[in-house]
Structures are given as structure tokens and as C-alpha cells.
């Protein structure tokens, strides 16, 4: 998290979607003037939102609204990227999950899964992505906050694993993992 907090406060200080929505609302209501691209200010979606909400603001998923710290990078995504990277380093990513199940149509009963093979690495990547992108849908982050947070967490984890490698007294042949971009790394 230290890497994410450094980027949030010392480098980027990016506003959150909720705050940008407030800027847009204030400009459309002629309460303030911001440097917002004309294409957005003339978008037909604004009239649709205003007619439904009686405001240019969209409802938030969280009653308390967004956190008050900067958006970029997403802390949840950074942690998810780091944890997933460490797990992929220690477990066989190519292991195929035997007899996977999916949720049945009633939402309660498990049914056999018959799609493509599910691997440990693929499922870990999906988990990290779900953790990262879930807060985008809630209006708390921009997509780039999450995708770059995953990459930052991955880089931090690889750096820590590399540092720890030097402290290993036993014969160590390295750890192999697949990065989120599909490239292979040997630590």
C-alpha cells in the first residue's frame, strides 16, 4: 500500500469520478467553470441523466460516497495485484481445476461446468480483476486506476520476491510466474 499511497499523494492526485461528476454538475448548472471537453458538455446523455435524476449527478453505490483520498492508483487493485502475483509464484499456475462447478439457473444449486479448462493462474487473474474492477462499477474509481493498480501491485510483489531471493540459504532455482500481460518472469 505504501507504493499506492505514494503515487496517490505525491505524484498523481487524480480526482475521483464522483468529484468529476460534481464539477460537471456545477458547470452545467452554471455554478462554476471548469476545463471540461466540449464533447462531454454537449453529450445527449446529460439530458437523459438530468431528466431521470433532476441533477447531472448519478447515484452512488456507497451511501457514504467516495473515499476522500485521490483515486490513482486504486489501493484495492494494488493489493490484489501483489497478492495474486505472490500466489502465482508459489503455486502451479497451469494446474487444471478438476471437476469445476458453476451456479445453476436457480442461483442455489451447483451444476457441472463444461467450458474451457480452468487453471489456478486463470482463476487468480479473474479474482484480481474482479477485486480491482468492482469498485469502478460502483463509481469509486476510473478504469485506469484499477488496471494500473494491478500492475503496480505486481511490480511491488516481484521486487519483494527478488529481494527475498537473496536471503535464501538453500539451493534456490527461482520462482516462475506469468505477469498480467502474459509474459513470464523468473525470480
Indicate where each model-derived feature is located.
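Hydrophobic alpha-helical bundle signature of multipass membrane enzymes
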Residues: 1-143, 147-187
Amino acid at each position: 500500500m505504501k507504493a499506492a499511497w505514494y503515487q496517490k499523494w505525491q505524484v498523481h492526485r487524480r480526482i475521483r469520478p464522483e468529484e468529476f461528476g460534481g464539477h460537471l454538475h456545477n458547470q452545467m448548472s452554471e455554478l462554476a467553470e471548469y476545463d471540461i471537453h466540449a464533447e462531454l458538455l454537449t453529450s445527449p446523455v446529460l439530458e437523459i441523466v438530468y431528466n431521470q435524476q433532476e441533477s447531472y449527478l448519478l447515484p452512488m453505490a456507497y451511501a457514504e460516497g467516495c473515499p476522500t483520498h485521490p483515486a490513482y492508483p486504486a489501493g484495492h487493485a494494488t493489493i490484489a495485484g501483489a497478492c495474486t502475483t505472490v500466489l502465482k509464484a508459489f503455486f502451479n499456475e497451469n494446474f487444471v481445476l478438476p471437476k469445476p462447478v458453476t451456479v445453476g439457473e436457480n442461483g442455489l444449486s451447483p451444476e457441472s461446468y463444461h467450458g474451457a479448462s480452468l487453471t489456478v493462474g486463470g482463476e487468480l487473474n479473474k479474482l484480481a480483476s474482479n477485486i480491482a474492477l468492482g469498485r469502478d462499477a460502483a463509481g469509486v474509481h476510473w478504469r485506469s486506476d484499477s488496471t494500473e493498480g494491478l500492475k503496480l501491485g505486481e511490480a511491488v510483489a516481484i521486487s519483494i520476491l527478488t529481494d527475498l531471493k537473496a536471503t535464501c540459504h538453500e539451493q534456490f532455482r527461482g520462482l516462475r510466474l506469468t505477469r498480467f500481460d502474459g509474459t513470464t518472469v523468473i525470480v
